Amino acid sequence: MPVVEPHLAALDQASVLLWRALGRGQLVQLFWRFPDGIDPEALERFRGGLAHTLLGRRVERSSLPFGRDRWVRAAEPGPLLVAPDALDPALIGTWTATAARLPVDPEDGPGWFLSVASLTDGGVVVGLTVSHVIGDGLAVAGAVRAVVLGNGGTTPAPPPRVRVTAGDRLDDLRVAARAVPGAVRGLAATVRLAREERDVVPGSLRRSVRSRPVGGGAVVDVPVVLARIADTEWRARAEALGGSTNTLCAGLAVRLGAALGRVDADGCVTSSLPISDRVAGDTRANANDTLVVRFHPDGVTSDLRGLRAEIRRGLADLREHGSLATAALAVAPFVPRAVARRLEEVVLENVAPVVCSWLGEHDPTVARPMGVVATDCWVVGGEPVPEEQLRRVGGALTVVGGSVNGRVGVSVRGWQPGAVTTQGELLDRVRRVFAEFGLPGAFH
């Protein structure tokens, strides 16, 4: 049974620092639909079991202002929130968007929560919403699997420190010292990134960070559409188009980006593809790198070979040279909050990416968290963002797909000012793009 490494890895440290700077952060949401209801006691056991997985921890600040934070044991499981009224199954997507507005706090807790709603057709929908600082999509799926198998997944993190001792400071200092070589390399990577983006970043960064307040205003319920398709049909269509299961998901994201108007001056869509490097026994919250692919949407609905080749080239380059962005994360503890806020805006204002994550085939246990097999299972990504900021950065689009028990679930979370701001408008685009690919599907 793996033991939780007490200090955060570089990507996890960067995630929590960005969360502190922005006052918000990315979420991972996992939803199940059960046709005949569930046992309330089984749901409560599932909630308690999650506290003994990687989700049962929170972030404790380092004793040093530039040090690595620590994982410590969370005081209690996340709460269970029950919807007061029965939900029309057609509105499950809308319900997931509402759940994204509820607060999670990876530092003070709760870092996650469960939500449940009865359906008017007699079924039940259950949601697990987790701060991305606590875990990525595969970490959350792994936590569910651990509870179902009854093995707890991992040894709980150490308890919080009652007080900071001289020994604690020395330990944090040792960890910080070991990180210095990586920080030096990270600084070099940051300089290279800045040079590569010199036509964009310097002018943007010269604008005062105080000229644009971050985090204010009403948070938008970004529309969510959930799609379901048989795994056999998904695989057959991918093969017919000369692609793979993950390339088909990427192709959908490219076409959806075009349908929402998320294209550059050349008509191309920039996709951000998380690439997992999670291994057995991995206790990192976020274990991935990011591949950025720029591709024109024309022709992708009839031939995926070009997109597949572009992704392969990018992966080969990532394996050989690594990611500059990942290397640059090592300097995150030394970046002032105001600069972190502005850097995020610079990227979003000038790139307007489409985030696409294909999680692959889940273990069947992921579909039966309470012992009963769910008919549908979806993972939803995104974050609660004020409308003023969403308009400024040109909206958002996240596509997440994966399969379990013979069914592929695809979630689309998107908002585009002046084009797509309601669930109905997003559903229209999703239906149209699925039809362009010749993909049948059921939608919520």
What do these predicted ranges mean?
Residues 185-243:
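Flexible, P/S/T/G-rich "lid" or insertion loops adjacent to the active sites of thioester-utilizing
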Residues 277-279, 338-343, 395-397:
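Glycine-rich, charged/polar anion/phosphate-binding loops
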Residues 1-175, 182, 232-237, 244-265, ...:
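Non-catalytic N-terminal regions of enzymes
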Residues 16-21, 213, 222-225, 280-282, ...:
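Short beta-strand/turn micro-motifs at beta-sheet edges
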Residues 255-290:
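A compact, surface-exposed functional segment
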Residues 96, 134-138, 153-169, 199-218, ...:
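Membrane-interacting alpha-helical segments
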Residues 164-179, 189-190, 224, 284-371:
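Helical lid/core segments from catalytic subdomains that handle acyl or acyl-like groups
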Residues 276-280, 361, 415-417:
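Short, glycine-/Ser/Thr-/acidic-enriched flexible segments
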